């Protein structure tokens, strides 16, 4: 609504991001799933529209349970999701169809409170998977989307929020997989670009995928915005005749102001492996609950392969606010291959100083 409002007012403003029509079409999980299925893009088995009726929801859940049994899955699971949710919010698992109604009611009420929409999605819960993303960029013409590779966001907290990201999503030349990883990467990029062209995508966006242990990709959703982890994709990407790695935020602004893309997929090159660590104020000994207190020392060793993005000062103590996301910093590490990136990542952590005390005075 905001994106539409700023462009429809008497004194129009420019919204830096996809057009409101694109956000309306792809920002909704239901619309995204319908579009994907119409283009033969694989999606997670389950409903392709918001369910508001409890009896209908239970019928769909029962059919998803039965489908998993037919597939030989020993412990079938159903995911109940707020259709307007995101970021891991408004999601709960169901292990037994007899418990479905209570979970459905809980998620429906949560969705109504948080998003003013009690629509609920019913999907198969796929376990033991990789969470991959495809980074897409296109200009206002919507005709020439390009991709800036893939990234793997499988390492997440108990709340399904990302903690470590790696680009590219798979490295088949350096690791062994139980499936054709190169083909999976090729397929999810192809599917993502196909959808972007179909809707005339016109800014920066991310296509999120689940890849099963058997190498089956399923589209989860499209994020019609720049994401926190854009930097790790940018770190391994370059544009011909442009100096250094690409700056995706600068591209978003430039395109948002109406400039043409100015390059094609052939101009985009990739080099090395990037790893991004999120430094989070959380307590792993107590279920990753927010850690509230005072940072007294924050320092790291500067390296040419390291990019640190942070709002936390290094020359004065810092009180961690409770009103905002507990993300303190992003550390982006580059290596010529996965082994070097991992080695450098360990070196960064060994040389990181992050000291402080919680509100009880405990170090």
Where are these regions (language model features)?
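ATP-dependent carboxylate activation and anion-phosphoryl transfer catalytic cores
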Residues: 9, 13, 39-40, 73-77, ...
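A polyampholytic, Gly/Pro-enriched intrinsically disordered region
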Residues: 33-44, 66-70
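Short acidic loop-to-helix transition motifs that present clustered carboxylates
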Residues: 49-56, 127-129
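Structural element of the ATP-grasp superfamily
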Residues: 33-37, 61, 122
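Short gly/pro/ser/thr-enriched loop/turn and capping motifs at secondary-structure boundaries
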Residues: 21-25, 33, 86, 154-156
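Short amphipathic alpha-helix with an adjacent loop that forms part of the alpha/beta core around
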Residues: 56-71
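Residues within well-ordered alpha-helices
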Residues: 2, 31-32, 57, 192
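A short, GP-enriched loop/loop-strand-helix hinge that lies immediately N-terminal to
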Residues: 1-28, 42-50
């Amino acid at each position: 609504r905001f994106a539409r409002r700023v462009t429809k007012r008497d004194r129009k403003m420019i919204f830096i991001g996809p057009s409101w029509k694109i956000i309306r079409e792809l920002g909704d999980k239901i619309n995204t799933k319908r579009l994907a299925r119409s283009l033969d893009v694989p999606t997670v088995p389950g409903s392709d529209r918001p369910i508001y009726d409890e009896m209908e929801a239970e019928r769909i859940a029962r059919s998803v349970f039965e489908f998993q049994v037919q597939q030989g899955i020993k412990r079938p699971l159903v995911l109940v999701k707020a259709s307007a949710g995101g970021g891991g919010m408004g999601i709960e698992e169901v292990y037994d169809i007899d418990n479905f109604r209570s979970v459905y009611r809980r998620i429906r009420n949560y969705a109504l409170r948080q998003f003013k929409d009690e629509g609920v999605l019913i999907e198969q819960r796929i376990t033991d998977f990789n969470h991959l993303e495809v980074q897409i960029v296109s200009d206002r013409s919507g005709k020439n989307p390009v991709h800036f590779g893939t990234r793997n966001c499988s390492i997440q907290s108990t709340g399904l929020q990302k903690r470590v990201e790696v680009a590219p999503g798979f490295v088949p030349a350096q690791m062994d997989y139980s499936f054709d990883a190169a083909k999976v990467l090729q397929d999810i990029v192809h599917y993502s670009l196909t959808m972007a062209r179909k809707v005339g995508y016109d800014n920066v966006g991310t296509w999120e995928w689940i890849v099963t242990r058997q190498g089956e990709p399923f589209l989860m959703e499209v994020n019609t915005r720049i994401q926190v982890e854009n930097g790790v994709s940018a770190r391994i990407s370059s544009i011909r005749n442009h100096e250094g790695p690409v700056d995706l935020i600068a591209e978003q602004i430039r395109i948002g102001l109406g400039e043409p893309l100015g390059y094609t997929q052939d101009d985009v090159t990739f080099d090395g492996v990037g790893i991004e660590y999120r430094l989070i104020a959380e307590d792993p000994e107590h279920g990753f609950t927010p850690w509230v207190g005072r940072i007294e020392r924050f320092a790291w060793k500067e390296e040419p392969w390291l990019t640190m993005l942070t709002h936390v000062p290094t020359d004065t103590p810092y009180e961690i606010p409770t009103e905002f996301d507990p993300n303190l910093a992003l550390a982006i590490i580059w290596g010529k291959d996965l082994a070097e990136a991992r080695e450098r990542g360990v070196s960064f952590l060994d040389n990181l100083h992050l000291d402080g005390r919680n509100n009880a005075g405990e170090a």
